């Protein structure tokens, strides 16, 4: 409520109070203001306790949905989807976590290993490079393309 009030404003109010009220009466006024704030806080807390004591049972049915809405507002999108769709089964949504997918062994890892350890040249599984001049692609324009 008073988060925008800083030390310069407080100092200004004290100086104005000193000028308007006077140095003789200022300590008594500060003590009275402090006592009034304390009495107001005490009255508010007593009213809260009385309302909670007298009407606590009737308001319990309202507190549960309000607390549920407040907990949903504090959740992130992943937690809300998990709660709504999968009855809070966290493991199901963790299966779709991209960080875990990339960290686990996938086909991408096998592909990277194949690139690091190439197969021997004499292996029959590797494709042979064609030695025929016609089958190799040519760069640019050629009369062979037209005829």
Curated annotation (Swiss-Prot):
GO CC annotation: TAT protein transport complex
Keyword Transmembrane helix: yes
Biased composition (Polar residues): 125-134
Biological process (GO), any one: protein transport by the Tat complex
InterPro entries in UniProt: TatB (IPR018448)
Region named Disordered: 96-147
Coiled coil: none
A Gene Ontology molecular function term of the record: protein transmembrane transporter activity
Major location category of this protein: membrane
Record localization: Cell membrane
Family: Belongs to the TatB family.
Known partners and oligomeric status: The Tat system comprises two distinct complexes: a TatABC complex, containing multiple copies of TatA, TatB and TatC subunits, and a separate TatA complex, containing only TatA subunits. Substrates initially bind to the TatABC complex, which probably triggers association of the separate TatA complex to form the active translocon.
Annotated HAMAP family: TatB
Function per UniProt: Part of the twin-arginine translocation (Tat) system that transports large folded proteins containing a characteristic twin-arginine motif in their signal peptide across membranes. Together with TatC, TatB is part of a receptor directly interacting with Tat signal peptides. TatB may form an oligomeric binding site that transiently accommodates folded Tat precursor proteins before their translocation.
Protein name listed in UniProt: Sec-independent protein translocase protein TatB
């Amino acid at each position: 409520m008073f988060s925008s009030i800083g030390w310069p404003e407080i100092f200004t109010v004290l100086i104005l109070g000193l000028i308007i009220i006077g140095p003789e009466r200022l300590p008594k006024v500060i003590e009275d203001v402090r006592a009034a704030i304390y009495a107001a806080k005490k009255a508010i807390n007593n009213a809260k306790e009385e309302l909670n004591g007298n009407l606590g049972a009737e308001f319990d049915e309202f507190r549960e949905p309000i607390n549920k809405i407040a907990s949903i507002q504090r959740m992130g999108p992943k937690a809300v989807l998990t709660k709504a769709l999968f009855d809070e089964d966290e493991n199901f949504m963790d299966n779709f976590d991209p960080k875990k997918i990339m960290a686990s062994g996938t086909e991408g890892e096998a592909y990277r290993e194949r690139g690091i350890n190439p197969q021997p040249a004499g292996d029959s599984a590797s494709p042979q490079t064609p030695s025929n001049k016609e089958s190799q692609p040519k760069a640019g324009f050629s009369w062979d393309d037209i005829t």
